[in-house]
Amino acid sequence: EIGCSPEFLSWLTDPVLNGGGALTDFGCYGANIATWMLEGETPLHVSCIAKQSKPKLYPKVDDDTTIVLEYEKIQVVIHASWNWSHNRKDMQIYGSQGYINCINHNQMELMTTEKEGVKTHQPAPISDYQKDPFRLLYEVVHENRIIEPNGLYSVENNLIVSKILTLATLAAEKNEPLAKHHYFS
């Protein structure tokens, strides 16, 4: 149903094998991008509702999750679901000066004033190493590529992402928001 090989799906849907359901499968992307955009800032509170909409198909893990990250000045909402009718990889960013709607990897809408309305934007293509994690690993090992701290691929960023997802899992289990001091030092 979600387009994975049987081998990957069996891992993805088994918490003992470290598959974590939709929470970790899709939640990691939102946490990663938020951490990158906020330059490594950690959330003050993490809330999470993780549920099973299709328990017969995914009996051991969640398949529909909402994670809310509360920061000092903003809030990030991550919808991680295997239950949408079609493939979605979109993002909306709302700010005091307008919004950005990232429809997909190459189509964006921007609005800064209602009078001028929505403008379309095509972002620059990403580099080859950003498309291919094995290429990136090769460049780090053999070509001394430096990964910027808090960049999307950095250890710093991904440690924060792991902590966010751990807190989200615990928040869902306890059915209550968890404060930063539960996991971030």
Question: Where in this protein do the model-derived segments appear?
Answer:
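Phosphate/oxyanion-binding loops and surfaces in catalytic or ligand/nucleic-acid-binding neighborhoods
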Residues: M37-E41, S96-I100, V140, A168-A172
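C-terminal helix-rich "cap/oligomerization" subdomain common to oxidoreductases
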Residues: L136-S185
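Short, solvent-exposed loop/turn segments that connect beta-strands within catalytic domains
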Residues: E41-T42, G117, R145-I147
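NAD(P)-dinucleotide binding in Rossmann-like oxidoreductases
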Residues: A50-K51, P55-T65, Y71-L136, G151
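Hydrophobic alpha-helical segments typical of transmembrane helices
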Residues: G30-I33, P133-L137
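Predominantly a Rossmann-like dinucleotide-binding segment in NAD(P)-dependent oxidoreductases
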Residues: E1-Y58, N175
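Active-site rim elements
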Residues: G20-A22, Q122-A124, I147-V155
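A generic structural signal for residues located within well-ordered alpha-helices
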Residues: F26-Y29, Y129-D132, E156-I160
